[in-house]
Amino acid sequence: MSHEKSLQEKKDSSSFKSFHDGASLENDLLQNLQLSSQTVLEIAQKKGRSKCPKCNSSRMFYCYTCFVPVESVPSDDIPVVKLPLKIDIIKHPNETDGKSTAVHAKLLAHEDVTVYTYPCVPQYHDQKHEVVVVFPGPDSVSLSDYLLYLSSSGDLEKNSAYEPSSKRPKFSPENDKNTYEGIDKKKPVNFLKKVIFIDSTWNQTNKMIADERLQGLVHVELMERKTFFWRHQKGTPNTYLSTIEAIYYFMVDYHTKILQKDYKGEYDNLLFFFSFMYRIINDAKKSAGKL
């Protein structure tokens, strides 16, 4: 389904609103997203579980093993999202497939998304100046700071400052402030080609993120975003996003801050399943008196 068609259907769809006005979660989350019609999901919900056309497993909406819609959800009614960057999702082997939102990305942007199950991890050493890992932590930086730094670095292969002694690039936007002031902010940054996302519960991530094959890559954190995932882990900050939320917000930030284009809902359909499931769960909680 084309983006133009999906925008024409936005009046029939669920929608979202900005997360930052302090309103209730439901009001925040059900306004303004330009989504394709979710009628197909509403019909499928009423029918109940259906077979996967590949493995014949009984599933609701989609098969999280085969990454395809179930028989009651016609593929033609599922939006297709084209991304400006390739995405690798590295999934922990103990992550419950049915609880992961990584499958949403593969279903909706299948040409640009590859899912690996750890310890199957590609080699990124020869691509380290073209790849970032979206992962929060003390050494993480914002997307804007990272790409501005690269813009000012010239020939990355010859830039000794970009060869870290501890295998991960170290830099400080504050220390490079004078350099930043000379950057042509109208010039798009085109050398970032791939983004890695870790799909795992937070207590399972340490071994994965420490894997030698992921060393030497800059960690980027989406510091201004808050999660609305219904399975958010207790004890973790609300800025720790679900996988599909992280992908969505990264793409929006890349589009507006790096490509410097007006955002017109190009990636909103990444939340096609997420938004619908959020609404179902919130409605159920309301009915049970838990909201």
From Swiss-Prot:
Region (Disordered) residue ranges read: 158-181
- Gene Ontology terms describing biological process: tRNA modification
* Record carries keyword Membrane: no
Reaction(s) the record says it catalyses: a uridine in tRNA + S-adenosyl-L-methionine = a 3-[(3S)-3-amino-3-carboxypropyl]uridine in tRNA + S-methyl-5'-thioadenosine + H(+)
Q: Which InterPro entries match?
A: DTW, tRNA_Mod/Golgi_Maint
Q: Where is the composition biased (Basic and acidic residues)?
A: 171-181
The entry's keywords: Nucleus, S-adenosyl-L-methionine, Transferase, tRNA processing
The record's subcellular locations are:
Nucleus
Question: Does the keyword section mention Cell cycle?
Answer: no
Q: From the UniProt record, which GO molecular function terms apply?
A: tRNA-uridine aminocarboxypropyltransferase activity
Motif DXTW covers: 199-202
Q: Which family does it belong to?
A: Belongs to the TDD superfamily. DTWD1 family.
Protein's UniProt name: tRNA-uridine aminocarboxypropyltransferase 1
Q: Which organism is it from?
A: Xenopus laevis
